[in-house]
């Protein structure tokens, strides 16, 4: 089965073609990502209207490019998968309308995919991970600890009360005057800094629940930067290093508890006759090398296989959407052409909203 994938949930326009066989293995034939960094850089963050217009301008071209690079034609495509949410409504509409039009014109099966499911299943695409496994999803819009039982079967163990980790990285970088996108810039600055210079809090460290909070850490950084102003280049590096160290300590604490919980639920998963259970880190923040190394060491201490997709598949891409769509279609699932985009679409539909996250709950 050959699928065309389309991803337009935020500030990357992406298309891909994959080949998916009956055994559930996929081969990426093309994976095109068009970044809007230059469009949003003057504003220091993503502007939804600009993002949607940029998707409109380039999506058709990228669909043709993905088909050409895969050396295939639309006629040879068996199904079309597109991100249906969560994300920015304007961008989601662009991708959905294009996918629906192609499906209607060609009569191909069509499925709207949860963007988070794309991230959640990327490790199955890249490493043939077996279920169940533990997933830490860390991106610009989401920070969640998820127990992945199977395709369509997700148990949210924890989520953020406030800012997603990627958002905290970007806002801290902006506060320090670092260029957009903030996450990579802050990671680079931290390499030259003293992580012990600025005392910063470790939010929820020691808490027995598996939730996250980063707004207090962000506020502490602002207070420290204000007290030290004007900031020298070394000051910026030291604050960046101290912030990143606080994040890593917090993640270590949360992940340690999650790994213990997984082992208590699946004690036989550590049977030496089988592949060790997997701890997967996915989402854009998973590209941070300091975070990767720390979590890899922690996973190995708990006898877990550590898996982080290659950086190109950590950030938003259409290959993961095509793969998630293929897994759904293989189970007989498709979407109606009148399906609407969802700005919020939790992986775990049964998870209750966190107290203190407002009427609509946490951003899941």
From Swiss-Prot:
UniProt entry keywords in alphabetical sequence: Acyltransferase, Cytoplasm, Iron, Metal-binding, Transferase, tRNA processing
Cofactor: Fe(2+)
CDD domains found in the cross-reference section: ASKHA_NBD_TsaD_bac (cd24133)
Principal place of residence: cytoplasm
Reactions the enzyme catalyzes: L-threonylcarbamoyladenylate + adenosine(37) in tRNA = N(6)-L-threonylcarbamoyladenosine(37) in tRNA + AMP + H(+)
SUPFAM superfamilies reported in the protein's UniProt record: Actin-like ATPase domain
Disulfide bond sites: none
Family from the record: Belongs to the KAE1 / TsaD family.
PANTHER family reported for this sequence: TRNA N6-ADENOSINE THREONYLCARBAMOYLTRANSFERASE, TRNA N6-ADENOSINE THREONYLCARBAMOYLTRANSFERASE, MITOCHONDRIAL
Annotated function: Required for the formation of a threonylcarbamoyl group on adenosine at position 37 (t(6)A37) in tRNAs that read codons beginning with adenine. Is involved in the transfer of the threonylcarbamoyl moiety of threonylcarbamoyl-AMP (TC-AMP) to the N6 group of A37, together with TsaE and TsaB. TsaD likely plays a direct catalytic role in this reaction.
Name of the protein described by the UniProt record: tRNA N6-adenosine threonylcarbamoyltransferase
Species whose genome carries this gene: Bartonella bacilliformis (strain ATCC 35685 / KC583 / Herrer 020/F12,63)
Biological classification of the source: Bacteria, Pseudomonadati, Pseudomonadota, Alphaproteobacteria, Hyphomicrobiales
Annotated gene: tsaD
């Amino acid at each position: 089965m050959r699928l065309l994938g389309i991803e337009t949930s935020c500030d990357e326009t992406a298309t891909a073609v994959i080949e998916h066989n009956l055994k559930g293995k996929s081969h990426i034939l093309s994976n095109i990502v068009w970044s809007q960094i230059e469009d949003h850089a003057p504003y220091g963050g993503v502007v939804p209207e600009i993002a949607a217009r940029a998707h409109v301008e380039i999506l058709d071209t990228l669909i043709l490019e993905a088909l050409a690079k895969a050396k295939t034609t639309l006629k040879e495509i068996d199904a079309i998968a597109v991100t249906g949410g969560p994300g920015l409504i304007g961008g989601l509409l662009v991708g959905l309308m294009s996918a629906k039009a192609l499906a209607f014109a060609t009569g191909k099966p069509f499925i709207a995919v949860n963007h988070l499911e794309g991230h959640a299943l990327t490790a199955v695409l890249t490493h043939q991970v077996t279920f169940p496994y533990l997933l830490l999803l860390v991106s610009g819009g989401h920070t969640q600890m998820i127990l992945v039982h199977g395709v369509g079967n997700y148990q949210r163990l924890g989520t953020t009360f406030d800012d997603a980790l990627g958002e905290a990285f970007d806002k801290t970088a902006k506060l320090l005057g670092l260029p957009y996108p903030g996450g990579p810039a802050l990671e680079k600055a931290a390499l030259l800094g003293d992580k012990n210079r600025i005392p910063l809090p470790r939010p929820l460290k020691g808490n027995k629940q598996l939730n996250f909070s980063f707004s207090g850490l962000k506020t502490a950084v602002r207070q420290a930067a204000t007290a030290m102003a004007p900031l020298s280049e070394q000051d910026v590096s030291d604050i960046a290093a101290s912030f990143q160290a606080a994040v890593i300590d917090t993640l270590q604490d949360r992940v340690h508890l999650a790994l213990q919980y997984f082992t208590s639920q699946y004690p036989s998963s550590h049977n030496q006759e089988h592949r060790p259970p997997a701890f997967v880190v996915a989402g854009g923040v998973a590209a941070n090398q300091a975070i990767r190394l720390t979590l890899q060491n922690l996973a190995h201490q708990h006898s877990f296989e550590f898996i982080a997709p290659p950086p190109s598949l950590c950030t938003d891409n259409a290959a993961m959407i095509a793969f998630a769509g293929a897994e759904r279609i293989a189970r007989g699932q498709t979407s109606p052409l009148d399906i609407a985009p969802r700005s919020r679409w939790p992986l775990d539909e049964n998870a209750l909203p966190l107290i203190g996250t407002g009427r609509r709950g946490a951003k899941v």
